[in-house]
From Swiss-Prot:
It comes from Prochlorococcus marinus (strain MIT 9301). Coiled coil: none annotated. It is an enzyme of class 3 (hydrolase). Belongs to the TRAFAC class translation factor GTPase superfamily. Classic translation factor GTPase family. LepA subfamily. GO terms for cellular component: plasma membrane. It is a peripheral membrane protein. Transmembrane segments: none annotated. GO terms for molecular function: GTP binding; GTPase activity; ribosome binding. Its EC number is 3.6.5.n1. This is Elongation factor 4. Required for accurate and efficient protein synthesis under certain stress conditions. May act as a fidelity factor of the translation reaction, by catalyzing a one-codon backward translocation of tRNAs on improperly translocated ribosomes. Back-translocation proceeds from a post-translocation (POST) complex to a pre-translocation (PRE) complex, thus giving elongation factor G a second chance to translocate the tRNAs correctly. Binds to ribosomes in a GTP-dependent manner. The gene is lepA.
Length: 602
C-alpha cells in the first residue's frame, strides 16, 4: 500500500513540439528528484524504443513517479506522464491529458510556438488542466525569451508573467519548475470512497507477462487481490501484480484515487486493453465508464509486400506481434499479380506508417516494398448505394458508379510570413481551398486550408518542410467527405493491369501523372525479346502510352551469301516466334521499377 495522502500527489504531463527539449527536461526532473541515480542515467530515459531515441520523438507513452521534498519541507509525489507530440498520436495525447491535473507547456526560446504544441494546448485546456509555461533552451545564443512570452500570450492567451526560464541541458531553472508543479498544479480530487474507476492511458506488450497496462486511478482504489473488469471490451481478469513506475516497476499491494501505476493480468493483446478504457472491479463495478473513449480508426492505407516471397509467413507473424503492442494497426492479406502475397495495412497517419515499416524492418529483419499510401474513398454506386474502399485497384468501373467522394481535412499551417507565397503555392498544387489567413505576430502567420487527405498523405509534410527551410509546422483534423471529379488511373504493361500502380487521381491531373508514369516505366523495365507496350488508362480510354522496343537477335549471321529465300525463311520463322512470345511472354517488372514509380507517384 502506498500511504501517501491525495493532497500530496501531483499528476502532470509535458506538452512540447518535436525537438523543443521535452525528453531532456524529463531526464533532468528524474535526476534532480533523485529518482534515477546519476550512474544509471542515459539520455532520453523515458523514450525506451531505439527508434524513439534516434528520431528524437516520443511514440509510446511512458510514466514515472518522483518523490520531491519541496521548500515547505513536505514530501510530495509527482507523477510525470509523458505524451507523444506528433499529430498522428493525438488520441493518445488526449487520454494522457485526462490522467493529469496540470501540464508544463515547453516552448523552445529560440523557435517559438509550433502547430503541434498548439493542438495539444487546446486539448489540455479542454481537460481543464493548469498550464505552466516553460521557456526551454534559454542558454542558446538565439534565444529571445521575452519575444516568445509575448507570442504565447498572443497566440494561446496564457498569462506568462510567471513563466519559467530554464535550460534542461545545463540544469538552470529545474528547481523552479518542481516548485511550480507543487504550488500551481491542483491535487487530484479525493474520491477514495466512490466506486473504483481507473483510466488506461497506455499499454504495451511484454512477451513474458502479457499486456502491461498503465493507468491512473480516478476514484476508489485497486487492490492486487481483486478481479477487474474492462468496461469497453467487457472482459474480466485476475490481477497478477500492480505497482508504480519509479521509473522501473515496483510492486505494491494497493493504489488509491489520484495515483498512477501499472498492472499485469495476463491480458493477451493490447487490443483487449485499449487506451481510454475504464478499469473497474468485477464484484462491485461502477455504473458508467469514464467519458471520451473511442477506438482509433486508421486514416492511411498501403500495401506491404516482402521483397522475397519466402518471407511472407515471417511478415504475417511479425505483424501479429506488432499488433499486440500497437492497437491502432489494422491489416488484412492481399495478393497482387506483380508483387505476390502481402498485406493491406491501415495506419493513423504517415508517421505511424513509417514507424511501423521501420520497426518491421529493424526488429523483425524483413525487407519490404511499400505501395503508395491511399485513403478511404466513398464510392456512390448507380443504385443509391455506397461503399467505402481503401484500395484503389478495387474501385468499380466507371459505368457501375455514379461518383467518388474523398475525405477532406482542415489544415492549419504556422510559418514565418516570408514563406507565405511558397506555402500558398504548395496548397494550391495540392487542390487546397483557401479559407483564412491570420497574422499571429508581426512576422508569423497562420494559413487555414481545406485539403483532400489524399494530397496530404503522400509527401506534403516533406515538401512543406523543404520549401520553408524547416520552419513551418502543421496540424490537421478530418472534416468529412466531398464529391470530386476523381478517376481511377490504371497502368497496363503488355496489356496486363499492374495493380500496385493503380491510383485515384483528379481528372485534371490524370494526364500529367499518366504521362510521367509510363515514361518512368519505359526507362526502368529491361528490354525483352518482344515489343512491350506500356499504357496509362482511365476505364477503357488510353491517355498515355510508350513502348519498349524488342531486343533483336541477328538470325542471318550464319548465312554467308547464298539464296535470298533461305534468309526470308529464317526471318519469317523469327517473326513467328516473336509473335508467339508476345502472346505467351510475361513481363517481369523489376522491384526497383515499382519503387521508383511509387516515389514518382508522390
Amino acid at each position: 500500500m502506498t500511504d501517501i495522502s491525495v493532497s500530496k500527489i501531483r499528476n502532470f504531463c509535458i506538452i512540447a513540439h518535436i525537438d523543443h527539449g521535452k525528453s531532456t527536461l524529463a531526464d533532468r526532473l528524474l535526476q534532480d528528484t533523485g529518482t534515477v541515480q546519476q550512474r544509471d542515467m542515459q539520455e532520453q530515459f523515458l523514450d525506451s524504443m531505439d527508434l524513439e531515441r534516434e528520431r528524437g520523438i516520443t511514440i509510446k507513452l511512458q510514466a514515472a513517479r518522483m518523490k520531491y521534498k519541496a521548500d515547505d519541507s513536505q514530501e510530495y509525489v509527482l507523477n510525470l506522464i509523458d505524451t507523444p507530440g506528433h499529430v498522428d498520436f493525438s488520441y493518445e495525447v488526449s487520454r494522457s491529458l485526462q490522467a493529469c491535473e496540470g501540464a508544463l507547456l515547453v516552448v523552445d526560446a529560440s523557435q517559438g510556438v509550433e502547430a503541434q504544441t498548439l493542438a495539444n494546448v487546446y486539448l489540455a485546456l479542454e481537460n481543464n488542466l493548469e498550464i505552466i509555461p516553460v521557456l526551454n533552451k534559454v542558454d542558446l545564443p538565439g534565444a529571445d525569451a521575452e519575444k516568445i512570452k509575448q507570442e504565447i500570450e498572443e497566440i494561446i492567451g496564457l498569462d506568462t508573467s510567471n513563466a519559467i526560464n530554464c535550460s534542461a541541458k545545463t540544469g538552470v531553472g529545474i528547481k523552479d519548475i518542481l516548485e511550480a508543479i507543487v504550488r500551481r498544479v491542483p491535487p487530484p480530487q479525493d474520491e477514495i470512497k466512490l466506486p473504483t474507476k481507473a483510466l488506461i492511458f497506455d499499454s504495451y506488450y511484454d512477451p513474458y507477462r502479457g499486456v502491461i497496462v498503465y493507468f491512473r486511478v480516478i476514484s476508489g482504489s485497486l487492490n492486487k487481490r481483486e478481479k477487474i473488469l474492462l468496461m469497453a471490451s467487457k472482459k474480466n481478469y485476475e490481477l497478477d501484480e500492480i505497482g508504480i513506475m519509479a521509473p522501473d516497476q515496483q510492486q505494491v499491494d494497493e493504489l488509491h484515487a489520484g495515483e498512477v501505476g501499472y498492472l499485469a493480468a495476463s491480458i493477451k493483446s493490447v487490443a483487449d486493453a485499449r487506451v481510454g478504457d475504464t478499469i473497474t472491479l468485477l464484484n462491485s463495478p461502477a455504473n458508467d465508464p469514464l467519458p471520451g473513449y473511442k477506438t482509433a480508426n486508421p486514416m492511411v492505407f498501403c500495401g506491404l509486400f516482402p521483397t522475397d516471397a519466402d518471407q511472407f509467413p515471417d511478415l504475417r507473424v511479425s505483424l501479429e506481434k506488432l499488433q499486440l503492442s500497437d492497437a491502432a494497426l489494422k491489416y488484412e492479406p492481399e495478393t497482387s499479380s506483380a508483387m505476390g502475397f502481402g498485406f493491406r495495412c491501415g495506419f493513423l497517419g504517415l508517421l505511424h506508417m513509417e514507424i511501423v515499416q521501420e520497426r518491421l524492418e529493424r526488429e523483425y529483419d524483413l525487407d519490404l516494398i511499400v505501395t503508395a499510401p491511399s485513403v478511404i474513398y466513398k464510392v456512390n454506386l448507380n443504385h443509391q448505394e455506397h461503399i467505402f474502399i481503401d484500395n484503389p485497384s478495387t474501385i468499380p468501373d466507371p459505368q457501375l458508379r455514379e461518383s467518388i467522394e474523398e475525405p477532406y481535412v482542415k489544415m492549419e499551417i504556422y510559418a514565418p510570413n516570408e514563406f507565405n507565397g511558397t506555402l500558398m503555392g504548395l496548397c494550391q498544387e495540392r487542390r487546397g481551398v483557401f479559407i483564412d489567413m491570420k497574422y499571429i505576430t508581426t512576422d508569423r502567420v497562420t494559413l487555414i486550408y481545406e485539403i483532400p487527405l489524399a494530397e496530404v498523405v503522400t509527401d506534403f509534410f516533406d515538401q512543406m518542410k523543404s520549401r520553408t527551410q524547416g520552419y513551418a509546422s502543421m496540424e490537421y483534423h478530418l472534416m468529412g467527405y466531398r464529391k470530386n471529379d476523381l478517376v481511377r488511373l490504371d497502368v497496363l504493361i503488355n496489356s496486363e493491369r499492374a495493380d500496385p500502380l493503380t491510383s485515384i487521381v483528379h481528372k485534371d491531373k490524370a494526364y500529367g501523372i499518366g504521362r510521367s508514369l509510363v515514361e518512368k516505366l519505359k526507362e526502368l523495365i529491361p528490354k525483352q525479346q518482344f515489343k512491350i507496350p506500356i499504357q496509362a488508362s482511365i476505364g477503357s480510354r488510353i491517355i498515355a502510352s510508350e513502348s519498349i522496343s524488342a531486343l533483336r537477335k541477328d538470325v542471318l549471321s550464319k548465312c554467308y551469301g547464298g539464296d535470298i529465300s533461305r534468309k526470308k525463311k529464317l526471318l519469317k520463322k523469327q517473326a513467328k516466334g516473336k509473335k508467339r512470345m508476345k502472346a505467351m511472354g510475361k513481363v517481369e517488372v523489376p522491384q526497383e521499377a515499382f519503387m521508383a514509380v511509387l516515389k514518382l507517384n508522390q
